[in-house]
Amino acid sequence: MELDLSVLGRSFIVTRRNSSITRPCIQSSNFSVRVLQRNKHRPLCFSTNPSNSSFIRFQKGCDFSHRCQFVVLSATGDHVGISQKHSDSTEKVDSIRILLKRGIVLGAVVCGVLFYGCGKVLASTSVVDVAFSKSILLLKNAWPKTSQVLKVLREQGLILAVLLGLSAFFSMAETSITTLWPWKVRELAEKEPENGVFRMLRSDVTRFLTTILIGTTVVNIAATALVTKAATAIFGEAGVSAATGVMTVAILLLTEITPKSVAVHNAQEVARIVVRPVAWLSLILYPVGRVVTYLSMGILKILGLKGRSEPYVTEDELKLMLRGAELSGAIEEEEQDMIENVLEIKDTHVREVMTPLVDVVAIDGSGSLVDFHNFWVTHQYSRVPVFEQRIDNIVGIAYAMDLLDYVPKGKLLESTTVVDMAHKPAFFVPDSMSVWNLLREFRIRKVHMAVVLNEYGGTIGIVTLEDVVEEIVGEIFDENDSKEEIQKKTGYIVMRAEGIYDVDANTSIDQLSEELNIKMAEGHQYETVSGFVCEAFGYIPKTGESVTVVLEKENWEENDEQDEGKHERQDQKEKHQIYRLEILAGNARKVSAVRFERVSDMDQVSEARDVKNMVPKFVRKWSSEEDSDGNLQAKNAVFDEHLIAETESMKKE
């Protein structure tokens, strides 16, 4: 075949795609090349033909059946170097085919050598009988059994090899199919023609697995029965034990471990090879497969078990795949976090993302629009809750954009109240509502702000569309946000020294647990560090107050195999971490900042009088101000007794 190269330059690409060749034009230069050799493991080499400078001539016998690219590397002198690029999947399929071919050849060679050797040994029986002397009488007595074993191997060895080979084939097929994710099979099937192997697999996976299991069972039983029959004929009852041991080792090594290891590491390529033969076999075994399927379904019904349709990929599997994609570099860590946030948004409640009422900036509805303008200049909020009489009595939402309608009407700015301009009524949502449903309501109602109510109908905060979006993409700031507002919104954890952290009270408890590598008690009712600190103290602490708490380490795993009596104290020491909490800032209503200082000296802990074990029990030292019933001494005695027991057990090894 010949190609006109009058439009090609000295650097060009010839691409093989579905029996057609494309030639991108680069520059005008006339020359021709002729195929000298073709080897898929080496670059193709072409040479110019001075007699005809406008054609490439390919020799007969050149195989272009593979999907590949030929790229001109150089065109100097009389030779042009061409490199061939195979896709990764094609190379893997070829490697699997080569592996299978080598396995078949190796098995054939072993069988041939075995049969040839058995024939030679059996032919030399008479010579052996003459050559044996009395000194090796024991070996001569064992020779008849050995001769019988060799004879059986010669007669039935080929059948046994075929059965073991089929068993290995079925094991590879089963592992390759079950290893592929359902979504991966679907993806591969969509890229194939109608008669593609993965389309066949996707159409009825159960039929393939049933066929494989039937085939595996039949060939393994047949191989075991064949060996057992021969061993029993030679060794009698002892042959059963010998056959069991030999077949156990043979099946494990030759038909289970080795084939399945190959299939696990090359699931896609192995499946591409084995699916079609299994499909043909399933047509033959279809009646048997249907009977087995009906029987298994009947047994499940008798046991009270019902099959249920599962999604292609569960949420946990999807998160696992996202983690693998992030580790492999396919996606960024931020992309992984965003996708996981979308998956978790249905389980997130409004109370977890809302702005609490104590932090809400609202305006009195009785004020004029001039007051609202001054309010907007100060806070720069585009939407402001409007209340009447009390901050928790929110009646509507005022839009700063609506002020533009009153600018031409100067007198109305003073005579019109904010409540008259506000959009009423406000959109109210329960605090238990999921963020996913809230987002849907925002889209339906075309609003960006809602008032959050508790179960008693009291206002506890507001939530905006920005709060919902931030649950997915992370915190969003604009040019008007000050440093204080950003810290108030996100919280912060600053490491002052080794084991010393300054933490903003608005920091989420999950962020604190991750940073300090600690685990909070299950079922806790707080969302921020402020709630944790208040629970640790038992009241709202003042600036300068401190308390020592015992927390559980996040990465600690209990070793059940250890002797409980001998290692209990050592386990407690490794399991828990002690922190001293000092209030850095706060007021009568809330805590603003707190310092976490890790305590490693157990003697210092023993001298402390205010240790509180946050996991799993909660104990505290009572102060004189809280002694309402006059039992201060009795209360502290109970505390001291518990404190001594806890600290001594953690101090001793």
UniProtKB/Swiss-Prot annotation:
Residue span(s) of domain CNNM transmembrane: 149-335
The CBS domain, residue ranges: 354-415, 421-479
Coiled-coil residue windows: none
Keyword Phosphoprotein among record annotations: no
Main location group: plastid
Cited SUPFAM superfamilies: CBS-domain pair, FAD-binding/transporter-associated domain-like
Entry protein name: DUF21 domain-containing protein At1g55930, chloroplastic
Organism whose genome encodes this protein: Arabidopsis thaliana
Gene: CBSDUFCH2
